[in-house]
Amino acid sequence: GSRGLGDVYKRQILFEGTDLLHCERSFLRELQGNDISVVFQEPMTSLNPVYRIGWQVEEPLRIHHPELSAQERKQRALTLLKQVELEDPERIYQSYPHQISGGQRQRVMIAAAMICEPKLLIADEPTTALDVTVQAQIVKLLKRINQKKGTAILFISHDLSLVRRLCSRVIVMKDGRIVEQGAMEDIFENPQQEYTQKLIAAIPRCVKKNSGRSAKTEEAHG
């Protein structure tokens, strides 16, 4: 491109047949937080430190469902906090972000993202700021949401072991371009592109074994 950004290609972001790059802003506002929700990688910076958790979880309802009463919003928020497996939802509801752990904050973000029952949940590196044990718990939670609610999940991650546990289809990107795409098993067991092969080869052997065992275990208990 003329500004040194490389070649410029025609781009589209299609959602149910509509190009989101060329639609009315009012249409986008209706989608955001309602049909499409996002969970970011650092919940502490995504949550407002001066508002209680309950108020923030309810925010999408105030925007997209103003017909609901305060009591109805609270009840739905408490239900979601319970569904994301937070103990003592009432206490979490009344808490401020700094009063709960990083893993709990990320579960809160997932609850807020799911409160309007979106068709698509974009999870942008949602486990990066968490320790390994909590990472695994969040991935299992996302998988259950996908299976029980039918919500499509776009999971963005550099951690291939987590990708393998959660995803059914994988798109490998390098420098903003698609290198390879296909079913999860095909990508991990028979990668075609050299870049993908190097990524797979870089996964520690113990992680590969554990990921495979976890996938089989989840399938057996699913």
Question: How would you label these PLM feature ranges?
Answer:
Residues 136-149, 161:
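Helical segment within the ABC ATPase nucleotide-binding domain
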Residues 181-182:
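ABC ATPase "signature
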Residues 163-165:
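A short, surface-exposed alpha-helical micro-motif characterized by mixed small hydrophobic
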Residues 1-9:
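Single conserved hydrophobic/aromatic residue that forms the stacking wall/gate
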Residues 115-119:
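A short, proline-enriched helix->beta-strand linker immediately N-terminal to the Walker B motif
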Residues 19, 72-91, 200-201:
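Conserved ABC ATPase "signature" region
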